[in-house]
Amino acid sequence: MFITYLLLIVAYLLGSIPFALVVGKIGYGIDIREHGSGNLGGTNTFRTLGKKAGFIVTIADILKGTLATGLPLIFSLDIHPLLFGLAAVLGHVYPIFARFRGGKAVATSAGVLLCYAPIIFAILAVVFFTLLFTTRYVSLSSMVTAIAAVIASIVNGDKIFIVAMCLLAGMVIYRHRANIGRIINKTEPKANFTKKQK
């Protein structure tokens, strides 16, 4: 039981690594919290630092969720992997290393799915990018994909999976509550990752 609690803490700490902040400060001398939306996530990194930094941060945030979800498998623990994934997402959203001001749960949640249900991850990736290229709203694409993840979990039938996806979707939508207002008011910025924004 001790190792389980220890690894849950590790999963949270792993999720707490603010890659957007690290990449911004080390690679560009910029505190990304002071630019754009101030969010420590891939979208704000794309918009503030450019495509290269955005890809690095997004992939790193995805891998946080993937590695954390895989911890019980690596250590042969008889406990549901999604608990560790949830801990990582919690860390990403409320990171102890960045004064509990983190991202919006999207990339790290995707990483959780990549480890636990890779086929569903692939399907949802198609949903996300189809919406993104159609609407150019990252926030809307993220929220709709989160809802699609809940539907996919219901089809799957695993009760823990359903609960986990409901929690993750709820977190994603909650963290995008300001974006919802801007989408309604038509003031939400659309995606443009072709160049670094000044």
UniProtKB/Swiss-Prot annotation:
Q: Name the InterPro entries on file.
A: G3P_acylTferase_PlsY
Q: Which PANTHER family match?
A: GLYCEROL-3-PHOSPHATE ACYLTRANSFERASE-RELATED (PTHR30309:SF0), INNER MEMBRANE PROTEIN YGIH (PTHR30309)
Subunit architecture? Probably interacts with PlsX.
Catalysed conversion reaction: an acyl phosphate + sn-glycerol 3-phosphate = a 1-acyl-sn-glycero-3-phosphate + phosphate
Q: Which organism is it from?
A: Bacillus cytotoxicus (strain DSM 22905 / CIP 110041 / 391-98 / NVH 391-98)
A biological-process GO annotation: phospholipid biosynthetic process
List the HAMAP family hit by this protein, alphabetically. Answer: PlsY
What GO annotations for molecular function exist for this entry? Answer: acyl-phosphate glycerol-3-phosphate acyltransferase activity
**Keywords, sorted A to Z:** Cell membrane, Lipid biosynthesis, Lipid metabolism, Membrane, Phospholipid biosynthesis, Phospholipid metabolism, Transferase, Transmembrane, Transmembrane helix
* Protein known as: Glycerol-3-phosphate acyltransferase
Q: In which pathway does it act?
A: Lipid metabolism; phospholipid metabolism
Q: Which protein family is named in the record?
A: Belongs to the PlsY family.
